Amino acid sequence: MAKNLILWLVIAVVLMSVFQSFGPSESNGRKVDYSTFLQEVNQDQVREARINGREINVTKKDSNRYTTYIPINDPKLLDNLLTKNVKVVGEPPEEPSLLASIFISWFPMLLLIGVWIFFMRQMQGGGGKGAMSFGKSKARMLTEDQIKTTFADVAGCDEAKEEVAELVEYLREPSRFQKLGGKIPKGVLMVGPPGTGKTLLAKAIAGEAKVPFFTISGSDFVEMFVGVGASRVRDMFEQAKKAAPCIIFIDEIDAVGRQRGAGLGGGHDEREQTLNQMLVEMDGFEGNEGIIVIAATNRPDVLDPALLRPGRFDRQVVVGLPDVRGREQILKVHMRRVPLATDIDAAIIARGTPGFSGADLANLVNEAALFAARGNKRVVSMVEFEKAKDKIMMGAERRSMVMTEAQKESTAYHEAGHAIIGRLVPEHDPVHKVTIIPRGRALGVTFFLPEGDAISASRQKLESQISTLYGGRLAEEIIYGVEHVSTGASNDIKVATNLARNMVTQWGFSEKLGPLLYAEEEGEVFLGRSVAKAKHMSDETARIIDQEVKALIERNYNRARQILTDNMDILHAMKDALMKYETIDAPQIDDLMARREVRPPAGWEDPNGTNNSDSNGTPQAPRPVDEPRTPNPGNTMSEQLGDK
């Protein structure tokens, strides 16, 4: 930045100097008015007058000099000078040199070209690239000394590491494979959700193999000029051939690898020409021995079939969400850089974070460290990890948001309705936490934490989720009446309706329609799908689908109403606990559902200075009472969040 500033300052100074040199030269001596000059001529004090246009350089008889200018054309001036015996010398007007004339005439054009080059360099990222280097590859090469990542830094995806381990062996000892006539896959496509470690795994391959590593994003190929994408692909593979054996890593390849001939661009756009060139380079007339192309995407369904055939991306490696053992390994990797308390158990944290990706777990460790730093602690304990988990799962607390007592009470009944239904319907995830502290965009949150990694869901579980989603709205309706039900259940209704429609149209849970697929194809144009949508059902079938969805929701809605009606005492008690503690966890919910006295949450401080402890400071044993009334097991399911 400093070098560019100095360069532009030097250019500005040079231009100013050039323009000053082209300007009229300054006359020597002082300047006097024209009337004084005429008086001195009449008084015979002038010896010589040099006339150059309107400028007169005067030399007096006492050798003093000055300059004056003729304001208007004076035809009598020459006669007057000759009469007084003044030596008159005529000088031709100054004309610019040929070089100056050329410069002045071409300067505007040169200035425009210079500005255009400047902006093109900025668009190309500046640096040492020329203004016309659009076709040069933007791939960045990392040498083996720059890549410090190894397989030891990658955890939670053992199967994926095994899949790519032979790539490392080939890059280390290619002769061992070539002797037996074996060919290593030319391309490996890593597929998986965001944040699962696809890019990290590619870097680990390069770090283990100790070979040059070219990295580029799929969006770096295509820009504003036609032909740039294909040119960059050619240049990238030319660089890779010089550095072979090497690895080319293309992140988010779906940016250029989408299916051809579909979408709004028809079959002839710049992206498709880039893809065509990539297909040729990967497996065309000329081979690329020693070059392994690794690509990553979370949308393999939109890629062109020619890109996925053997000879190009021979192998697809699925990098999925880690299981509980994988999450434990990932947490241990990220915990290396954090000072931990003695109570930290990565296995417990892993069991409490189902569905977390590697990036989510890294964020969890970082958030826990930040919580510890805010509390001026020297180590990170389980308390900070619990706070970090709640923040990631439910959103940050908004304690500054002012709520009236009536709003807090309505929110407490709403969240209590979710929790009670979720606790009493079969096959539902356990209630982890209920809070009426605003988090994120929600006024309150009821969070259900699965006991394990969910692979599939039964019909009963799905219907239980629908009942739980309507628990909040039903609690408001029972307590306040239909006229005073709030809009807080809008997201619950949306999730429940989509869930019921999927059960009917995709998962075959309708006796009337049977196990058939009725859902329409949902592909956006920009993802390489067709613009037109095909309708796969008649109007009569669509009407039956709507009836089945409504019947499914009404059945679970009525079941949830009956559960709350039978357990009104628990609903009121949970509301009171939420109004007092604001947040309750599983132990408090257990007490409420068993109709016992509620123990205070861990770390809760009574503003009145009293608590539920004996003289030794330990909580008193809860008082057992009757069990809640549960309905007969029926068909049932529930969403993770019931937000107010």
From Swiss-Prot:
EC main group: hydrolase
Keywords: ATP-binding, Cell inner membrane, Cell membrane, Hydrolase, Membrane, Metal-binding, Metalloprotease, Nucleotide-binding, Protease, Transmembrane, Transmembrane helix, Zinc
Cofactor binding, per record: Binds 1 zinc ion per subunit.
Stretches assigned to the Cytoplasmic side: 1-4, 120-644
EC numbers for this chain: 3.4.24.-
SMART domains named among the record's database cross-references: AAA (SM00382)
Ranges of the Periplasmic topological domain: 26-98
GO process annotations (BP): protein catabolic process; proteolysis
Pfam assignment, any one: Peptidase_M41
Topology relative to the membrane: Multi-pass membrane protein
Family, per entry: In the central section; belongs to the AAA ATPase family. In the C-terminal section; belongs to the peptidase M41 family.
Protein name in the entry: ATP-dependent zinc metalloprotease FtsH
Organism of derivation: Salmonella typhimurium (strain LT2 / SGSC1412 / ATCC 700720)
The encoding gene: ftsH
